[in-house]
Amino acid sequence: MQVILLDKIGNLGGLGDTVNVKSGYARNFLIPQGKAVMATKGNVEMFEARRAELEAKVAEQLAAAEARAEKVNALEAVVIASKAGDEGKLFGSIGTRDIAEAITAAGVEVAKSEVRLPEGALRTTGEFEISVQLHSEVFATAKVQVVAAE
């Protein structure tokens, strides 16, 4: 199924690209999310008329994400207190939700879906560098310090 992308999508293409995708992916994800429209003659003309507006919107989102990334990078170490055993092993774990809430409490709005933990949840005390993906092209690094709760 041919669709016109209205947003940059990883491993697929950028704004304005006409790509061929499976019909289920287009019908169930891309079109309902507003990330693509079917590549009909009318939609192609409508897209060309709105191209500047859509490019400005994408540029604005990118600029906002870069501004948030600077704020996240400027943060001091975000401290999260959790119950821990004698050797620094946590009872439970620190996940993306906990990290997102701690960064938001420190003054920068971050959603849990933006926090990247490739090695999984944090299970020990110590300092960690956490990657935060604020946009498909914008990454920030937050320092998180996990301490044992009193």
Curated annotation (Swiss-Prot):
Keywords: Ribonucleoprotein, Ribosomal protein, RNA-binding, rRNA-binding. Gene3D superfamilies: Ribosomal protein L9, C-terminal domain, Ribosomal protein L9, N-terminal domain. It comes from Vibrio parahaemolyticus serotype O3:K6 (strain RIMD 2210633). Belongs to the bacterial ribosomal protein bL9 family. InterPro entries: Ribosomal_bL9 (IPR000244), Ribosomal_bL9/RNase_H1_N (IPR009027), Ribosomal_bL9_bac/chp (IPR020594), Ribosomal_bL9_C (IPR020069), Ribosomal_bL9_C_sf (IPR036791), Ribosomal_bL9_N (IPR020070), Ribosomal_bL9_N_sf (IPR036935). GO terms for biological process: translation. Binds to the 23S rRNA. PROSITE patterns: RIBOSOMAL_L9 (PS00651). The gene is rplI. The keyword rRNA-binding applies. Disulfide bonds: none annotated. One of its GO terms (molecular function) is structural constituent of ribosome. Pfam families: Ribosomal_L9_C (PF03948), Ribosomal_L9_N (PF01281). GO terms for cellular component: ribonucleoprotein complex; ribosome. The keyword ATP-binding does not apply. This is Large ribosomal subunit protein bL9.
